[in-house]
Amino acid sequence: MRVCWNLFLQLQGWTIRDEFPYHLKKCVIAVGPHTSAWDFVVGLAVRSNLRLYHLNFLGKAELFKGRFGFFFRKVGGFPVDRFSNNNVVDQVVEKFNASETFILALSPEGTRKKVDKLRTGFYHIAHAAGVPIVMFSFDYDHKTIYSLGA
């Protein structure tokens, strides 16, 4: 499968700059900007390319309903009800504490729409779990993915 994802990145013209800090067994990956549904597909390809098979992500609850719910869970997704105050931070911190290796990727914008400020959940999760934050940036103009690691 890794070969297919690498071929996808190559055919689409994407390059990955910098190295992922593989010494980290636990971290929060903040990915931005989140402007396209293609971010998810490119993210899956990057995950495979970097061999981050145990990477998890948060996604809006609507993605996990219906026929694609199984797929999103299978690739590491956890549904989040963005309009409910159900203490997602505590739930995710529990997952960090229960696992020897746990990497969580999410978009600080929380949406594909243009926003004036980032949501701070990624910071609160990392702080409460005592794990570093690794930044990833998708530069669509230059088809380059940057990792600004810990």
Task: Show which residues each predicted segment covers.
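N-terminal membrane-anchoring alpha-helices
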Residues: 1-15
